[in-house]
Amino acid sequence: MTILLSETAILPTPLGGTLVNALHRPGHDFDPAELRDLPRLALSERSAADLEMLGTGAYSPLRGFVGEADYLSIIERMRLADGTPWSIPITLPVTREQASELSGRVVLTHGGQDVGWIDVQEKFEARKSFEAREVYRTEDPAHPGVAALLAQGDVNLSGPVALFDVPRGAFPRHHRTPAEVRAVIEARGWRSTVAFQTRNPIHRAHEYLQKVALELVDGLLLHPLVGATKGDDVPADTRVKAYEVLLDNYYPQERTLLSVYPAAMRYAGPREAILHALSRRNYGVTHFIVGRDHAGVGSYYGTYDAQEIFSAYAPQELGIQILKFEHTFYCQSCGQLVSPRTCPHDSSHHLVLSGTKVREKLRAGETLPAEFTRPEVAEVLREAYAAQG
């Protein structure tokens, strides 16, 4: 793989040309008393995460929850109505009763706190079956993304939003907005940066992919998703501890940056891979790793569907280079991490542990093999599962 590095460009332009900033701080940008008599809408975990992504510019060029024209265009052709690449509609669903009562400026709440507002411009019917078929490639209610879609309200509100503050939450050291990540990249002088998206603890195969990529670029952004995930996924706080010990012991500090990615998982496989790549461009990243079954769940998507879908766009449209890697694993005969391209041995020689198998071992108090994950990571996971009882 040959990658040509720019000698001058440090940061790619955000999608749409400008990084959206919809932060409006109470007491600074407006008088909180203005909100006293406005209607309020409580957000779900996913919608609260979407509000943050919109407000900080992570979802540039979107300035709010999408309207009907963009909604249909995204579903039908993976583009906004103006032709800009975009793969998943970012909507604000409500019930019919709520839709009939909400208009104008609506204060958005989460956890009992005012977190932002939306200026409602449109209300339109959600095409749930159509959205499920096109975005998730299935209408199976067992699919977690489809289940969430079917459970939400039947009407979508559209309009520009304001975000009152960045919810740094449990990870204040690692929670950075796109503008803040861009500032770190610029300060470090990285001409090229690769991002790695994960919702799982990093095992040796992930480490291998990251370090191969790091041979080709100046910096690595380890960008774990910490928004809402499936109930059986490893909790975000445990994963972040695992990332910290891994980076402290096995990565060059000056060439790596750990920063959390506050989006919620949709488990939309190929479509979500595009969303993850485009949003990383907004964070100032030039390259994005897509491995096997990116953002997938169960057997709904083919192993490399999330790589092949990028052919729907011209490379210059994306503004970020996709690094496509095959499945990697430890081969006991080769004595190292390999891929099908480099290993001549059949699967009986390979050490491959599924997420389910890893969780079974941890619940049983078993030690994960060193060929699968670093001992420091294994210990973090073991302690976390032991504490759960």
From Swiss-Prot:
Annotated metabolic or biological route of this protein: Sulfur metabolism; hydrogen sulfide biosynthesis; sulfite from sulfate: step 1/3
The protein's name in its UniProt record: Sulfate adenylyltransferase
Cross-referenced PANTHER family: PTHR43509, SULFATE ADENYLYLTRANSFERASE
GO molecular function: ATP binding; sulfate adenylyltransferase (ATP) activity
Gene: sat
UniProt-listed GO biological process terms: hydrogen sulfide biosynthetic process; sulfate assimilation
EC numbers: 2.7.7.4
InterPro entries: ATP-Sase_PUA-like_dom (IPR025980), PUA-like_sf (IPR015947), Rossmann-like_a/b/a_fold (IPR014729), SO4_adenylyltransferase_pro (IPR020792), Sulfurylase_cat_dom (IPR024951), Sulphate_adenylyltransferase (IPR002650)
Domain of life of the source: Bacteria
Keywords associated with the record: ATP-binding, Nucleotide-binding, Nucleotidyltransferase, Transferase
Key word Nucleotidyltransferase present: yes
Catalytic activity: sulfate + ATP + H(+) = adenosine 5'-phosphosulfate + diphosphate
UniProt entry tagged with the keyword Transferase: yes
Similarity field: Belongs to the sulfate adenylyltransferase family.
